[in-house]
Amino acid sequence: MKTQLKGDRVLAEKEAVAEFYKTGYFGRPKGEGLELSLVEAAFLLSRGKLEIELEGTMLDFRYFFEQASLRQPNFELKYIVYKDLKERGYYVQPSAADFRVYPRGSHPGKSAARIFVHVQSERQLLPVKLLQDSVISAENVHKQFILAVVDEESDLTFYEVKTAVPKGEMTEPYPAIKTDATFLEDRVIAWDAQASETLYKRGFYGKMLDSERLQLSLVESLYLFSRGIITVRDRKGKVFSFDEFIEKASEIESFFLRKYSAYKNLRDSGHVVKTGFKFGTNFRVYRKVESIEKIPHSEYLVNAIPADFEFRLSVMSGAVRLANSVRKKMLFAVEKDEEIEYLDISRTKM
């Protein structure tokens, strides 16, 4: 069947509606003919189902592929993903999110699409705002959002991305006590033996320096400070104000306040939050801890990121793969105005 390449579309005559759309759901009817996207046309051309003409010249697959790449950004990436999904047996249609994918055993007209797919090269930076907006758009119409990443060898990795509202089960985020502590070089120590034991065993804060004294991280210290649990002094005995503590902590960690915002949000929502350093993340997070002697496996790994953050996909891939390999969810805590919004990213199979 002969077709015409026009701009970023391939136009076919009336008979194509019956041959391609009504049987395979390729393209969309327009007027009396059929309009195919470039990836759909390339797929059909590769299988010898149609011929494509440009200004009187018939295009072979190579020439058409080159022309399509000139006319549509990321064409080759989209074709790789489209071809993969079609060969898996899915009905796939182009959409604003790159593709919409129908459930197995279904097709357009029988049921609604189930998945929105966004295509990305491993080399491209991915703004978190773009990802958030895309996920929310999908979830608003009850769709699953899939990020399809094409690596330099044209292999595909699929990630499910969704919003999350983590909820913990700790009823007492901080014990009702008051005690003194000292800000040393890059951590804080609480000195009172009873208070240290209570914070450690009931609140699951810090790590005991010895049988009587408790070491606290900077985010733990500011959280307890903000709740009036500890009074923090410098090494000469001067009491810190809240702002002075933040200023000093920020000299030690440039992103301290962003990290603290995520920590506070997680603690306030009933979680136990500990360092995620061994996993290469900001935090490991527990929904419930009943005893310091029997700490369960953490449910989440969390990285705090700013609203203008751009993912390097190789780094994101490593974080997600590690989290999934140890049966944890990888959450990204996005600081947005005064709120924290979470993205849950996990590898998935199509």
UniProtKB/Swiss-Prot annotation:
Function: Endonuclease that removes tRNA introns. Cleaves pre-tRNA at the 5'- and 3'-splice sites to release the intron. The products are an intron and two tRNA half-molecules bearing 2',3' cyclic phosphate and 5'-OH termini. Recognizes a pseudosymmetric substrate in which 2 bulged loops of 3 bases are separated by a stem of 4 bp.
Keyword tRNA processing: yes
Record-annotated active site: Y286, H297, K328
Self-association state and partner proteins as the record states: Homodimer.
Family designation: Belongs to the tRNA-intron endonuclease family. Archaeal long subfamily.
Swiss-Prot/TrEMBL catalytic activity: pretRNA = a 3'-half-tRNA molecule with a 5'-OH end + a 5'-half-tRNA molecule with a 2',3'-cyclic phosphate end + an intron with a 2',3'-cyclic phosphate and a 5'-hydroxyl terminus
UniProt xrefs under InterPro entries: tRNA_endonuc-like_dom_sf, tRNA_intron_Endo_cat-like_sf, tRNA_intron_Endonuc_cat-like, tRNA_intron_Endonuc_N, tRNA_intron_Endonuc_N_sf, tRNA_splic, tRNA_splic_arch_long
GO MF term list: lyase activity; nucleic acid binding; tRNA-intron endonuclease activity
Alphabetic keyword roster: Lyase, tRNA processing
Record protein name field: tRNA-splicing endonuclease
EC number in record: 4.6.1.16
One Gene Ontology biological process: tRNA splicing, via endonucleolytic cleavage and ligation
Major enzyme class: lyase
GO CC annotation, single: cytoplasm
Family annotation (NCBIfam families): endA, PRK09300.1-3
Pfam short name (any one): tRNA_int_endo_N
Keyword flag tRNA processing: yes
Taxonomic placement: Archaea, Methanobacteriati, Methanobacteriota, Stenosarchaea group, Methanomicrobia
